[in-house]
């Protein structure tokens, strides 16, 4: 997007003000310190040892955390301690007027960190203890101070030494039944011969053993019954989750000469201490009670509750929230089955997944009449049955100046008391473009709607026996959409889909649509058709009306949870096929008409035959408290087959824009090394292809908190690369086809910086992109473009620096 002149002047003033503040912040912040004080300006951790570089990086990050490095230097913004300078303006310079009262909010201030050598020594002690807990019993930590002009920096030198690995694993379990459970699950053990010793691994193993024992019915089993003993010591070193190893290092001195020092571990599971030498008792489920309309602070003994005894469950309620048959099937507990912690979690999650209840609480109480029996009580607090919402959107991209949209959404979460959800939505939007002459013009308009039904089970048009414990949801949807690109084309589409959605695990999700049907109708503006489409056979075939019907399968993996706060992954793969069953219907119609007609001739619409595969992998690293590194790799390919020569326009790949390669405008990059320099490119610059490769790296960091922390100003720097290609040669677009030996030459590369305003519930993003490598640039054999940069030339900046404004992160 090119900003209008007045906007650029305003932005220039803002950036100039920011530069002045940063320059002031770079000035000395030490003049208010006492003579014997110094400002703590930096800390560094050097890790040396015979370990992998990735392990060194993880150790360096852990040792730099606030919990171990007790004194942290003041944060810097663009090499300036602006927050310390602002602090001094408020408390030492006593600045106070309306401007400073806004700027000098507490969120934007940092008290100068005065260096304290005692805290450095405490950090050394904590780091050493942490390294011992990671199995580095011979580790040493030293530090060096560097003082200059009342500023101190500290370097911590860490030598890891050799890491202990586990050797022999033995078990001391007097209860033979529990010992059998442990051995049956031993292949899943986290402590095995050759594994590096870490106290966290033993803690995780304790949790794993506790879980499998509780899943076998041992309701009262306590994790504190599990102890670990190392080597020949008869001392339980790991009675607690965190264990300092001070005082025990001398035990392992005999291992110093070994290439890989080892230790034996004995796992001991004690019998319950409160009942002498008796063994742990297995419990089973006795009775199950459900309260489907239980209010907050309700009374389960309320005499006005109606009671309905179903096959497995006694339902107590004032009114029917869910049909009793469906209610009983949704509860996964069964009388007579052993107590299971996993079944507890599955039951709660299944009931939450229905979407009917706001709170789900499952409690167990011992049955007074039967030994080792538990009664289960499910307290369910309902949500509101119907929801109505309105969403407003404002957007911007390099393709249009201003976009706005509104959507109206309605949802009934419990249709006919069956757990079926009815959803309806209407949406409309426009895109406006500000021309060089100044006036705003309408570039596109869109409106559409969708109706969907979601069943909390595996729904089929015929009856089959199903496992009640399945978490499959069935979804049927019907939608329509109309998109008009002014003076170019109108696209009308109607789509129908039927399929299933389920979670294989907490990290893995499947979306399967065995039936999808999409009709796409295209009406071309006559002038656009004559001047652009008719001159491009590929574009002409792309804009033909089409029937897209087939199957769609998606697999999603995401481990973004509390266990993976430092780094986590996201992976999605999607496979779509169109034409297989439509061609079958086409053949049947043709045979029934004596080969006179078929589905295509009757509807005057071509069947689209293609297979499309996409894969999207992302990984995120948290770098300290205020930084993060986000990476993404995307690959996609679509292959037309049978009578189809090209993919439908709405299924083709594009590159460039705020969520792609940001140094190019939306949909203008590629394919390959092709550059459209014809007059039609000014009318319709969109470029599409059959395949796409893309990679992105983005470093994100915090800048300032504003208005009491309600708005956070964040920054980013990024590197994007990729392109689109054709599968086959296109004589009208030379260089557009994919050739492996030309891959490096064809890859486009761009870099840039960005700022983001984070309002918590949404984020506004402004990115500046500039090309590093241009596939169609002929001045360098590999397309490197840096030598052509002319940042002083306003016309060059206008044509090469791309401004992208968008809502949300690019990935």
Task: Name every feature range the model reports, one short phrase each.
Residues 1-10:
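N-terminal secretory signal peptides that target proteins for export/translocation
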Residues 3, 28-353:
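Interaction-mediating elements
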Residues 23-26:
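C-terminal motif of bacterial Sec signal peptides marking the signal peptidase cleavage site
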Residues 136, 218, 385, 417-419, ...:
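Strand-connecting loop/turn motifs
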Residues 178-181, 320-321, 340-572, 587, ...:
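Gram-negative/organellar outer-membrane beta-barrel architecture
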Residues 301, 395-400, 511-712, 717-742, ...:
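C-terminal outer-membrane beta-barrel translocator/porin domains of Gram-negative envelope proteins
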Residues 390-392, 422-426, 476-478, 571-575, ...:
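Membrane-embedded beta-strand positions of outer-membrane beta-barrel proteins
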Residues 406-412, 449-455, 496-500, 551-559, ...:
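Residues on the lipid-exposed face of transmembrane beta-strands in outer-membrane beta-barrel proteins
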């Amino acid at each position: 997007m090119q900003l209008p002149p007045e906007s650029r002047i305003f932005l220039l003033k803002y950036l100039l003000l920011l530069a002045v503040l940063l320059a002031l912040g770079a000035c000395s912040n030490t003049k208010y310190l006492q003579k014997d004080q110094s400002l703590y300006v930096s800390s560094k951790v050097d890790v040396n040892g015979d370990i992998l570089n990735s392990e060194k990086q993880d150790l360096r990050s852990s040792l730099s955390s606030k919990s171990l490095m007790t004194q942290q230097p003041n944060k810097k913004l663009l090499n300036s301690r602006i927050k310390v300078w602002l602090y001094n303006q408020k408390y030492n310079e006593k600045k106070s007027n309306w401007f400073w009262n806004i700027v000098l909010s507490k969120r934007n201030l940092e008290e100068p960190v005065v260096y304290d050598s005692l805290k450095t020594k405490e950090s050394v002690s904590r780091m050493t203890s942490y390294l011992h807990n990671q199995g580095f019993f011979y580790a040493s930590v030293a530090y060096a101070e560097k003082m200059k002009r009342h500023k101190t920096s500290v370097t911590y030198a860490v030598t890891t030494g050799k890491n202990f690995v586990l050797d022999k694993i033995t078990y001391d379990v007097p209860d033979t039944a529990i010992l059998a459970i442990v051995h049956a699950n031993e292949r899943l053990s986290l402590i095995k011969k050759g594994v590096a010793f870490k106290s966290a691994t033993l803690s995780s193993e304790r949790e794993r053993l506790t879980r499998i024992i509780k899943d076998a019915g041992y309701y009262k089993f306590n994790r504190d019954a599990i102890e670990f003993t190392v080597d020949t010591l008869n001392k339980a070193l790991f009675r607690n989750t965190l264990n300092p190893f001070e005082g025990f290092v001398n035990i392992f001195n005999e291992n110093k000469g070994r290439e890989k020092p080892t230790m034996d571990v004995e796992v001991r599971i004690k019998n319950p201490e409160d009942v002498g030498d008796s063994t742990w008792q297995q419990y089973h489920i006795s009775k199950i009670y459900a309260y489907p309309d239980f209010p907050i602070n309700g009374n389960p003994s309320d005499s006005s509750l109606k009671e309905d005894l179903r096959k497995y469950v006694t339902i107590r309620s004032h009114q029917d929230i869910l049909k009793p048959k469906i209610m009983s099937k949704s509860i996964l507990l069964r009388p007579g089955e052993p107590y299971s912690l996993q079944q507890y979690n599955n039951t709660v999650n299944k009931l939450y997944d229905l979407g009917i209840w706001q709170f789900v609480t499952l409690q167990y109480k011992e049955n007074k009449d039967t030994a080792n029996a538990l009664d289960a009580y499910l307290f369910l607090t309902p949500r509101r049955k119907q929801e109505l919402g309105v969403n407003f959107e404002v957007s911007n991209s390099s393709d249009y100046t201003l976009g706005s949209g509104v959507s109206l959404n309605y949802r009934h979460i419990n249709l006919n008391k069956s757990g079926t959800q009815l959803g309806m939505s209407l949406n409309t939007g426009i895109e406006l473009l500000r021309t060089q002459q100044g006036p705003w013009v309408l570039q596109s308009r869109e409106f559409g709607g969708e109706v969907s039904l979601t069943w909390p089970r595996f729904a089929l048009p015929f009856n089959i026996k199903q496992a009640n414990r399945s978490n499959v949801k069935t979804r049927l949807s019907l939608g329509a959409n109309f998109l008009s690109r002014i003076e170019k084309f109108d696209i009308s589409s109607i789509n129908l889909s039927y399929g299933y959605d389920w979670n294989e695990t907490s990290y893995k999700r499947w979306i399967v649509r065995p039936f999808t049907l999409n009709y796409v109708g295209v009406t071309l503006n006559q002038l656009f058709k004559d001047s652009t489409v008719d001159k491009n056979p590929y574009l002409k075939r792309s804009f033909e009306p089409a029937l897209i019907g087939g199957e769609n399968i998606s697999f999603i993996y995401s481990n973004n949870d509390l266990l993976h706060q430092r780094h986590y992954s996201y992976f999605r793969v999607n496979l779509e096929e169109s034409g297989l069953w439509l061609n079958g219907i086409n053949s049947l119609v043709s045979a029934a008409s004596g080969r006179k007609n078929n589905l295509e001739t009757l509807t005057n619409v071509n069947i689209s035959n293609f297979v499309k595969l996409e894969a999207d992998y992302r990984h995120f690293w948290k770098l300290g408290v205020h930084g993060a590194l986000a990476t993404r790799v995307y690959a996609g390919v679509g292959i037309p087959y049978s009578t189809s020569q090209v993919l439908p326009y709405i299924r083709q790949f594009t590159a460039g824009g705020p969520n792609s390669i940001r140094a190019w405008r939306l949909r203008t990059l590629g394919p390959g090394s092709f550059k459209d320099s014809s007059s039609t490119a000014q009318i319709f610059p969109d470029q599409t292809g059959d395949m796409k490769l893309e990679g992105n790296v983005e470093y994100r960091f915090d800048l300032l908190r504003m208005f009491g922390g309600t708005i956070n100003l964040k920054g980013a720097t990024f590197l994007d690369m990729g392109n689109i290609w054709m599968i086959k040669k296109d004589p009208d677009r030379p260089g557009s086809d994919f050739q492996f030996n030309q891959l490096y030459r064809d890859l486009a590369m761009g870099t840039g910086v960005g700022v983001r305003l984070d309002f918590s519930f949404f984020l506004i993003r402004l990115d500046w992109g500039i090309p590093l490598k241009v596939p169609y640039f002929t001045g360098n054999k590999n397309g490197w473009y840096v030598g052509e940069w002319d940042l002083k030339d306003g016309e060059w900046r206008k044509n090469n620096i791309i401004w992208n404004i968008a809502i949300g992160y690019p990935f």
